[in-house]
């Protein structure tokens, strides 16, 4: 069917005679949704409440309200949704997983190119991580115009090609350029994931599914040092990057075969349907042809580009992002610099072998894997932060003391493990809060969250010189104190005044 012949289907999810559009009501009432069916009768009236679609057990109102169309991802089967969540979680691992490979190769690269580990750390790991954050801003602009799937697919293909370039790079400059480009273009799944979860799952299940998705990119920076540290100890650093390229290729293949477009334009009246069906629709959607045809119904370029700037200044978003950015970012900082603490000979470091460093990086992986009403207010999500912050402080202080005073390996493991548990708890709470507060801007929320955590991770640039001069306990203790101060400043304020700010 030609573009001009694009068919449209009227939504049956909202009555024409009603003043309330149930398909977009969750966006209009951002941050405050009626979950209990009985409460809905009081809040919305009997007439509107009788039209609300409920969960299978009849105990919860579904937000967003599903349409009657089989194209609506809210109506997909549980297995179909689970497959898409699995795919986006696998893809979300790629950016930080690839950047983390540099941790395993830092000493071999320094030896091969006759430079210091600090230079290699800054030139490769730090810059590639930094560019992951900025790439997300461009991704969300493209997604608003062309959909989730084509941006996800092409970003992963390009990322795989740049990883291959890093694997085969003949010199350090080429290697660093390939690493940075792979980070910049590969960040799409870390933005798309929040979209996919909210596209497919109703409000009351979103935090649970966000746990699964965030697990992917929280654990990913530690997976590659843990897995490939043993490999680099036996072969060369190129094998580690080659294995990372293979993983990216597997993700691309899975996206090619099984990933689906979850973007559904439920806010348009009537809701536009895809111009093709079957295999042709599959191929055109993957390549971006369908997105080009559907773009005329979606945001203009001006609106897509300006959208991030319309929300970033909001105090309820900016404050919580600074808090989470420092908390998550300092976690990135210790991930990048711990290899130096562990691998440097005494008295500054522990003098671990490549095998010992690789085994130690299994700690945060295990830690994250182990720790997985009527009217709902978004600020309720933030109560989890009261659990996360004390754990974070304990973890950082124990880890700093272990490094400075050369305590047992158990102290290192316990400190790092507790800190990563805290980051997992806090990240899910903050993402869920931001998603609830800005239901029309899930991509922007993901992009700014990604940028905030990366900017917070810039501590790696000065963490090692600081620790050399004043000790690791002071460094990690100050970082924990900064997070605690931001928590006291931001979280109670949002819980008291968040509804008014919204």
Language-model regions: role of each:
Residues 216-266:
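Helix-loop-helix hairpin linking two adjacent transmembrane segments in secondary transporters
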Residues 96, 126-129, 133, 140, ...:
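C-terminal transmembrane bundle
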Residues 1-80, 259-304, 371-378, 501-502:
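Intrinsically disordered, low-complexity terminal tails of fungal membrane proteins
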Residues 134-173:
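Conserved MFS/SLC helix-loop-helix module at the cytosolic interface between two early adjacent transmembrane helices
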Residues 178-217:
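Cytoplasmic helix-loop-helix junction between adjacent transmembrane helices
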Residues 80-117, 189, 334-340:
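Extracytoplasmic
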Residues 98, 113-114, 135, 146-147, ...:
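Helix-breaking motifs and short loop linkers at transmembrane-helix boundaries and internal kinks
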Residues 81-99, 180, 313-333, 417-418:
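Pair of pore-lining "gating" transmembrane helices in MFS-fold secondary transporters
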